Amino acid sequence: MTIFGKTIPNPIGVAAGFDKDAEVYNSLFKLGFGFVEVGTITPIKQYGNSKPRVFRLEEDEALINRLGFNNLGSEITSFRIQNNKPNGLLGINIGPNKDTKDRIEDYLVCLRKFHN
């Protein structure tokens, strides 16, 4: 199967939120996932929303996620990826910092940091 000009072994991947800080993506490839997405990554480190931030709706059999993009920031994440080359198709989910004054610039900062 080919996606974005890259061959992947299968269409089953791991979405952003599982490996928020790009710590285990190569292990996920070894488990057999066809692609992995890390993040969400913001320009600078942030801790996310205060707890509680995950809520269970038993009647609806659902969860509400209000984690708030807790992550180590683009500098550390970029360093990790550069020093631990992905063994598969790696996506990077980017987002703005919670208290930013310019959300568009936050996206551009991350895009410039990771696009290579």
Predicted regions, residues:
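Hydrophobic faces of well-ordered beta-strands that scaffold small-molecule active sites
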Residues: 12-16, 34-38, 65, 77, ...
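A gly/proline- and charged-residue-enriched helix-loop-helix capping module
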Residues: 39-89
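Acidic (Asp/Glu)-rich catalytic clusters
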Residues: 29-30, 80-87, 112-116
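N-terminal amphipathic alpha-helix/helix-capping segment at the start of soluble metabolic enzymes
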Residues: 1-14, 76-86
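Active-site beta-loop-alpha junctions enriched in small/polar residues
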Residues: 17-19, 41, 95-99
